[in-house]
């Protein structure tokens, strides 16, 4: 019955131009997941709300009920939304996509560090954007993710930033299979880890985007996206002002960045 219902609402979604790429069960009994294909933020937000309406209407035809409450049953896993967020240029270049050698990819590191700064400075705003009453029954002590905002970067990126912060020379040697990365004279050999491994992080980097995992299942994601856009925009503006000041003082751009 559930499979038939999901196929039907997927068909209705396709008719409205909403593309879906995932269909599988989740941890709780009769809990299932679908994932719209990514697109521009405003369009993705509209499609997300339209999809919720479609699911409710199609469920009635199948004599089912879709529950969007974040924690409808005590002691059973609740529901949420994973908001995948990245930033691209007008020509489609993903500014959060690392190169083959992340320590040399100045553009990636600049934008990545600006996002980290934004989350560090405005973590209370991020939490406020998802702090509904029903979602509070899910976050924190009840189940992952925790209510405390943090970013999981993976050991490779963490090591790169630690090295830069310590003002040591960053050298790297990547073999043809990219099986290991060495940053000489700073940290030991590390194996590339899956940045998606830590499923408890509420704001995790997953290869070429950040995944905000604390959004409630009944929420309009517009608030969360608006907050992320705003705090990152502020961080980038201040980053640009800082670099411009160093350039005005005589430093070249690469050194200033």
Give short role names for the model-derived ranges.
Residues 1-68, 73-257:
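Glycine-rich, acidic/polar active-site loops that bind/position phosphate-bearing ligands
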